[in-house]
């Protein structure tokens, strides 16, 4: 059989004679191999993802911060990539988590292979991954993102099923976009979220993206307040029969004027309602308000049927 390494803990004392010279020693040897194995397993659980074997968020953030500290001393730039798979939720919802886990494991292996030896990479969320690496002078920070997209965009085959997942990737640069891993990952996440909403791809962070996110968050809070306090309005656009010139109906349109007196375009607040989970509440309010208006018109003798 092949030799096996074992860990031992040695404790002992030295007995000295009258001249203070050692004359004998005695002690114990304790086999601690099992204890070391347990410690190693606990370390793996604490710092590595059990499904993919990649460093977890805690470990990845720590390693990336060490890279930033080294880059700061050397005066070099670091790129931080935030990777999110585009259609992974559909796989879990349609085929279950066993299939989803196998697909994710394959994608994680590709992700690891596409990263260079000295890169820091980790799984930071359900289907979210990060990669940090030092930029060479003149290197395009989006080039690595494109390489990752190519590797992750190839079909994954599992149990005779073929899945095309793909990835959206946001990129932030040290020191231009932040001085800590937390800030860089947040900014890369913002860039990823923006490009994902536009159909996927890769995007370098800029300050305008941060302002755009702040406005979206602010609008979400204001919209929730407006719905709770019935501050939206229904405007009705008439439909006229061209041959007779008579009114044949109206189209109900949701409109919102915020507390500062600014009209918010439906093209802006409806996507926010979808993101914040308010779209059903908005629909309920629209139908309720339209029903009230129909009743009012009927009581006034008008026979107008709105299209909501």
Regions found by a protein language model. Name each.
Residues 18, 32-35, 88, 202:
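Sensory-module boundary signal marking interfaces of small helical input modules
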Residues 36, 43-47, 53-79, 86-116, ...:
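Conserved long alpha-helical elements within nucleotide-processing catalytic cores of c-di-GMP signaling
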Residues 1-12, 21-23, 246:
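Per-ARNT-Sim (PAS) sensory domains and their PAS-associated C-terminal
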Residues 215-272, 296-304, 308:
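Active-site core of bacterial EAL-family cyclic-dinucleotide phosphodiesterase domains
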Residues 17, 132-141, 159-162, 167-184, ...:
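Catalytic strand-loop-helix junctions within cyclic-nucleotide turnover domains
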Residues 10-12, 27-29, 166:
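Sensory-domain boundary capping and coupling elements
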Residues 121, 147, 151, 157, ...:
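Cyclic nucleotide signaling catalytic output domains
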Residues 21-31:
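PAS-family sensory domains
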């Amino acid at each position: 059989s092949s030799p096996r390494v074992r860990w031992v803990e040695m404790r002992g004392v030295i007995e000295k004679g009258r001249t203070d010279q050692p004359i004998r020693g005695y002690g114990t040897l304790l086999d601690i191999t099992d204890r070391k194995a347990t410690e190693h397993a606990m370390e793996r659980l604490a710092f590595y993802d059990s499904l993919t074997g990649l460093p977890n968020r805690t470990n990845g953030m720590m390693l990336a911060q060490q890279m930033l500290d080294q880059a700061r001393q050397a005066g070099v730039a670091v790129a931080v990539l935030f990777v999110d798979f585009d259609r992974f939720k559909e796989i879990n919802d349609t085929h279950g988590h066993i299939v989803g886990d196998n697909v994710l494991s394959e994608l994680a292996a590709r992700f690891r292979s596409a990263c260079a030896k000295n890169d820091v990479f980790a799984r930071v969320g359900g289907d979210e991954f990060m990669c940090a690496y030092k930029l060479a002078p003149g290197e395009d920070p989006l080039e690595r993102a494109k390489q990752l997209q190519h590797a992750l965009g190839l079909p994954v085959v599992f149990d005779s099923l073929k899945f095309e997942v793909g990835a959206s990737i946001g990129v932030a640069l040290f020191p231009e976009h932040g001085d800590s891993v937390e800030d860089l990952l947040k900014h890369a996440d913002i860039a990823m979220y923006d490009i994902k909403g536009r159909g996927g791809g890769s995007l370098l962070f800029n300050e305008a993206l941060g302002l755009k996110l702040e406005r979206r968050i602010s609008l979400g809070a204001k919209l929730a307040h407006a719905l709770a306090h019935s501050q939206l309005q229904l405007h009705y656009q008439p439909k006229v029969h061209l041959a007779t010139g008579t009114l044949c109906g109206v189209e109900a349109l949701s409109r919102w004027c915020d507390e500062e007196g600014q009209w918010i375009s439906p093209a802006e607040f409806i996507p926010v309602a979808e993101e914040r989970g308010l779209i059903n509440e908005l629909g309920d309010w629209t139908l309720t308000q339209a029903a009230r208006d129909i009743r009012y018109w009927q009581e006034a003798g008008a026979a107008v049927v709105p299209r909501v």
